[in-house]
Regions:
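Alpha-helical transmembrane-bundle signature of multi-pass membrane transport and export proteins
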Residues: 1-427
Length: 427
């Protein structure tokens, strides 16, 4: 296999100027968001010196993401996705500006900071599903997986760069400048999407409110491939997410050095960036379901071995492998969702994917913490990895369509429930 086919597929950057602008804006906004997150955590801790309040930062972001996300997808399936994204992006930028104002003023109650974060997350719950339809609408079917891989590697690179850069800016100038840079990043994201054409949903708009949410649930229940993709992701995150266990495992087995802990956290990201950079052969393979199952199984197996090893270097290698496997699975899952979902439902299903992608890891860290509290960090890691492996095997065995070769954009036969969910309401 040639090197050019192994490295990340950059055809979307050559063939689609609109995608190039979008990727530039998205990369900038992800960088700004990670810088702002460092500032938020530091500011809340500096104001309260309480782990309860710093924990509330995650709640202020996660709760609106779940609640508003249920209906944000329906909104994206009723109107022009470009306009919805632009309005929501302006809202996020305004929230970042208000965070900067409160940081410069000082002496603002911590509840105000959390409230601004919650509103910011509400806008993100709307912009995410709207942006989720851009790639399949802008790129040919055979380039969708490559476009998603480019999105993934840009996000992971900013995940590595953003916290470090945010810490430097925070130390030099304070939290207010971090928030201002975050607001600027949303201006760049606005620029990236401003030149897009109108992107209304194909066919009739979705039903409003709870009816639209129920349509999405009927689609997920009826489409075995998309349902299997989301269940596989939940198996990998809810059952085996290791991040919350790293401090305990580091203390139990590797001496408790903060440098080792930092390397553990970085190793997963390094694996993810490496997998994205070498994703060309994967995105061209045409079997995203099989790749996703293998990636999720490798993730679980690597975490089992990490829980059993006593060598920090072997542990780092296994975490790099786990990060690479997870990224491969995420790219493949997104490819399945983007290419197998009717456009009329894509906003709502993307919202479900967003909730799964963000809620699953939080639940997984909670599961790991509870099991470790009853037993040990090693037991929590090994049991989680084994349960992930068993769950992935079950999903793969019960959903043979996931293992089949399928050309991008060619859906499997759907059930009557699926067709009903995608059909417009005429009542």
């Amino acid at each position: 296999m040639s090197l050019t086919r192994t490295l990340i597929d950059v055809r979307p950057l050559r063939t689609s100027p609109a995608f190039r602008r979008l990727l530039f804006g998205r990369t900038a906004s992800v960088l700004g968001s990670f810088m702002a997150m460092v500032a938020v955590m530091y500011q809340v801790w500096d104001m309260t010196h309480s782990t309860v309040w710093t924990g509330a930062v995650g709640l202020a972001q996660a709760l609106p993401m779940v609640v508003v996300g249920l209906f944000g997808g329906s909104l994206a399936d009723r109107g022009d996705r470009r306009r919805i994204f632009l309005v929501a992006t302006v809202g996020q930028g305004v929230c970042s500006l208000l965070l900067a104002v409160q940081a410069f003023l000082g002496h603002v109650p911590v509840a105000v900071v959390l409230a601004l974060l919650a509103v910011h997350s509400c806008f993100g719950s709307v912009s995410g599903p709207a942006a989720g339809v851009f790639v399949p609408r802008l790129l040919p079917k055979e380039e969708v997986a490559a476009g998603l891989a480019l999105n993934q590697i840009s996000a992971q690179a900013m995940m590595l760069l953003g916290p470090a850069l945010g810490g430097l800016v925070l130390g030099w100038t304070g939290a207010g400048v971090c928030y201002l840079l975050d607001a600027l990043s949303f201006a760049l994201a606005f620029y990236g999407a401003f030149g897009l054409p109108s992107l209304p949903p194909d066919g009739e708009p979705s039903r409003t409110g709870v009816h639209g949410v129920l349509d999405r649930l009927r689609f997920l229940a009826g489409h075995r491939v998309v349902r299997g993709a989301l269940l596989t992701d939940l198996s990998a995150t809810v059952l085996a997410m290791p991040m919350g266990l790293f401090p305990l495992v580091n203390a139990e087995r590797f001496g408790g050095s903060p440098r080792t802990l930092g390397l553990f956290l970085s190793a997963v990201a390094v694996g993810g960036v490496t997998a994205s950079a070498l994703s060309g052969s994967i995105t061209r393979l045409g079997r995203p379901g099989l790749v996703m199952l293998c990636g999720s199984g490798t993730w679980g197996g690597a975490l089992v071995l990490f829980g059993l090893t006593s060598s920090p270097w072997a542990g780092l290698g296994l975490l790099v492998l786990a990060g690479a496997a997870d990224t491969t699975a995420v790219i493949s899952r997104s490819t399945i969702v983007q290419t197998r979902t009717p456009d009329a439902l894509l906003g709502r299903v993307t919202a479900a994917e967003q909730i799964v992608g963000q809620g699953g890891p939080n639940l997984g860290n909670l599961r790991g913490g509870l099991v470790a509290g009853w037993t040990s960090g090693t037991v929590a890691l090994v049991s989680g990895g084994l349960m992930c492996l068993l769950a992935v095997v079950f999903v793969g065995a019960s959903t043979p369509e996931l293992r089949e070769h399928a050309e991008p954009g060619v859906p499997h036969e759907t059930t009557p429930e699926l067709r009903d969910a995608a059909a417009p309401d005429v009542s």
